[in-house]
């Protein structure tokens, strides 16, 4: 299991992608293993993807929501 806040390898890094949850398109900049909440006091971690839109702003989403464009 990855360490908390560790950057993860992803086959779509630096490629054009779409966030299927919001429809946002951009370049996948990073995937980071982050705390997303707690269950019975235990932290829960999930891979979070960061997509940079053409405007330069970044959006975070679940890594499972990332889809290749094209």
Task: Describe each model-derived feature in a short phrase.
Residues 2-70:
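Basic/aromatic-rich interaction segments and small domains that mediate binding to polyanionic partners
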């Amino acid at each position: 299991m990855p360490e908390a806040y560790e950057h993860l390898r992803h086959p779509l890094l630096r490629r054009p992608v779409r966030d299927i949850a919001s429809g946002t398109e951009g370049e996948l900049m990073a995937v980071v293993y982050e705390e997303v909440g707690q269950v019975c006091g235990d932290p829960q971690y999930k891979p979070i993807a960061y997509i940079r839109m053409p405007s330069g702003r970044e959006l975070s989403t679940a890594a499972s929501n990332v889809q290749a464009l094209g």
